[in-house]
Structure formats: C-alpha cells, structure tokens
Amino acid sequence: MQINSHLSRLVYDVAAKYGDREALIYKNFSGKEWKSCSWNQFSGIVKQVSNAMLALGVNVQENLGVFSQNSVQYLFTDFGAWGIRAVTIPFYATSSEQQIQFMVNDAKIRFLFVGEQEQFDKARRVFTTCRSLERIIVFDSAVQLPEGDSTVMSFTDFLKLGEGLTRQAEVEQRQQDATMDDIANILYTSGTTGDSKGVILSMGQFHAAVEANHKDVPVDENDRVMNFLPFTHIFERGWALLCISVGARLIVNTYPQEVQKSMREQHPTCMSSVPRFWEKVYHGVQERIETSGAV
C-alpha cells in the first residue's frame, strides 16, 4: 500500500509495487466490451498526460476543467495534472451551459476536458462567452470534431504531445517541489441557492482523509472496486484515492443507469454508494414481488 505517497506520485508508486497487475477495468464511451490496463500502463499514460500538459504550457497550480462522466481518461487527466502540480476542477456531466460558463470564468480555466458529444456541444456553445477558455480536449473518440479548428482537440491527439516523455525531467522537478499545501481540486457547489461556490481541497486534505479511512475501511489489493458515483462527487473521489492507494482494481462505471448491469458482469467486492441507490434497488425488488405470480 502507498498510503503515504503524495498525490503527484501516487500512481507511479503503486505501479512500482504492482507492475503488470490489473489496475483499471472499463468500457470506452458507448462501448460494449470491457477492457483493462495494468498499473504500469496506468502510470505510463499518466506520465504522458503530464508531459502533454507541459507541452501546452500548463502552469503550476493552474486550474483545468473536467466535464465528463466517469472514464479512465478522467483518471488519467486528474493524475496527470497532479503530476505537474496543476489543479483539476470537476464539473458534473449534466451541468447546464450557464453553470459551465460561470465555473470556467470564475476559475479562469484555459483548458477544458470533456467527455462525449453532449458535453462537447455544450462547451462549444459557451466557448465565446468564456474569456479565458483556449481549448477543448475531448475524451470520446466518437465525437465529430470540426476540421481546421485549433480550439478543439481529441484526447488521442493530446496524448501525442506527450509521446517520448521529453519533458519528464520537468515533471519530476515539479513533483520534488510539491507540498501538501498544493491545491488538488476545486469542487463547485450545486448553486441551487445562488451562484456556485468553489470549495478548495488541498493535497494534504486528501492525504489525511485516505490515511484516516485506511485505518477503518477494510479494502485491499485483492478487492474489485466499482466506481459508481461520479468522480465529481467528493465521496467517490476520496474512495477512489483510497482504493488506488492500496492497489485495488477499479471498475469504472461510466453511465449510472448501467450500474446494475456492470455489477452483474464484473462482480465487484465493494463500492461506495448513497442511500438513494439502495432505495431504488429495494423498490425494484418489491415491485417484482408484487407483480409476480404465486409460487
């Protein structure tokens, strides 16, 4: 386990211990087949993301937006950003154009990572109203990108900027300079009673949460962990960090409505959840009992 690792190096350190062992199980956006990658592959892509971000000129503690459903690209982006001491700001995948515009302008975001077509379309529609926004980077390879538009880029092309890890020395220098006071995330409130408020979370706060929960939550390298709640949710975010720290396999569920199907197919040993999910399960079982015939 790597409970004491700084977030900027967490995936590197876990990969050094578990190597080619399976780390992530996932489907591509709208994909049918489950895929997987090892800890070494996870670490390698995170390094590539960090190098690509440096190629774009991402600064220390610069804010980067992530507007997507759960995906492996989401994890690669988070850890790649932390690897160069940048800050990620997660947006809920269902955020409105007004919410996106407010958060991008409030946090002065230059680079916005988006999931699939719906998020891309919303981001494009507010682009001209976001003074700081320079580029949209799209996770889902199925999204149709306009030709000749330098303000949009596929995640595949983004990764090419990091090929060869030519800036890895700078990445490692930033990691040496990293502290627990560095900001890791800014999580915006729902804004139901007014404008959203950005809640600042430091590396040290996440480290303390992982350390405290590790003492009482019995999850380890043998577990298969389902990520069901959105990574935007602080509960799921902290849970994922704990599970990565101990080397557990993460099963990334992209679409919430598919979670029961994902559970049947992947047989997770544990997951974080909220009461509402189990209320739905209970009512579903009750409905089946009431509509089924007598035995």
Task: Describe the predicted segments one by one.
Residues S36-N40, A184-V210:
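Conserved AMP-binding A3 loop
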Residues L10, L56, G83-L161:
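Structural core segment of the AMP-binding/adenylate-forming
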Residues N51, S95-T128, A209-M226, P256-C270:
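Conserved ATP-dependent adenylate/AMP-binding module captured primarily in the ANL superfamily
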Residues G19-E22, I137-V138, M153-T156, E163-Y188, ...:
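Conserved pre-ATP/AMP-binding loop-to-beta segment of ANL
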Residues L24-F79, S96-Q101, S154-E163, M203-G204:
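Conserved AMP-binding/adenylate-forming core of the ANL superfamily
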Residues H207-R224, F231-V295:
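Conserved AMP-binding/adenylation subdomain of ANL enzymes
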